[in-house]
């Protein structure tokens, strides 16, 4: 297909922002929602432990392919090395949110492998099980949720707990189920989600917009929204500042 065209300033991190402060806004949201759902957090609850950033290299030909420009503009010359443009679109950091440790990583390559697009990988490790979302070739690049019991948990008790949890979710999400994983899937269980509930990444933006418009109509929002937003951006700025130290 045709490449997604971008304005030239899209590759200026001073205007567009670096990767470590871009997509990470959504990922930090996910950590907060999953680890502390509907709980008010404070910036003092978050401490970044390590952070780094690195660049993706764009050749002049690649830049022209996605912008239509035959050369790098003057305002990007400070990011040109050996004739190529270095874009700090990648970053990762580890941090502690209250008593939960989390790692956030964003990688932007110029082009995804054929047949793929944006992909997401996530693991939540608990004392009794791990929940992992994989979106690789085996999953046909669609997100799939796996459940893996912890080594010290009895298999029978684990199955009972999994089936009880799925049964409770079925009340809100009819059709959701679980099946035993295959050897290749390297897990105990696979959560199966019907097509009508598997709405995809883009539909999530509409859902967020619907929530915002509802808050606007009602003239209020949950008490945790504002403090958690402040905590999110404070966390990201800690990571941004730490990633630049020593450069």
Where are the regions that the model predicts?
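C-terminal helical cap and adjacent loop that interface with cofactors, partners, or active-site loops
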Residues: 15-44, 88-95, 99-103, 110-247
């Amino acid at each position: 297909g045709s490449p997604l065209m971008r304005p030239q300033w899209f590759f200026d991190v001073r205007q567009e922002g670096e990767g470590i402060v871009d997509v990470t806004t959504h990922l930090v949201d996910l950590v907060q929602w999953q680890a502390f759902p509907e709980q008010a957090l404070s910036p003092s609850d978050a401490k970044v432990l390590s952070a780094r950033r690195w660049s993706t290299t764009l050749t002049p030909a690649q830049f022209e392919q996605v912008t239509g420009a035959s050369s790098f503009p003057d305002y990007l010359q400070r990011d040109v090395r050996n004739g190529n443009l270095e874009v700090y679109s990648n970053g990762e950091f580890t941090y502690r949110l209250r008593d939960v440790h989390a790692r956030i990583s964003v990688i932007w390559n110029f082009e995804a492998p054929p047949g793929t697009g944006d992909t997401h990988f996530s693991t939540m490790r608990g004392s009794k099980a791990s929940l992992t979302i994989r979106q690789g070739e085996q999953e046909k690049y669609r997100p799939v949720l796996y459940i893996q019991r912890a080594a010290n948990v009895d298999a029978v008790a684990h199955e009972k707990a999994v089936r009880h949890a799925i049964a409770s979710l079925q009340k809100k999400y009819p059709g959701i189920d679980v099946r035993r994983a295959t050897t290749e899937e390297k897990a105990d269980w696979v959560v199966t989600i019907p097509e009508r509930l598997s709405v995809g990444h883009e539909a999530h933006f509409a859902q967020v917009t619907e929530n915002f418009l509802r808050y606007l109509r009602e003239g209020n929002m949950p008490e945790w929204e504002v403090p958690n937003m402040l905590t999110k951006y404070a966390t990201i700025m800690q990571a941004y500042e730490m990633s630049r130290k020593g450069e």
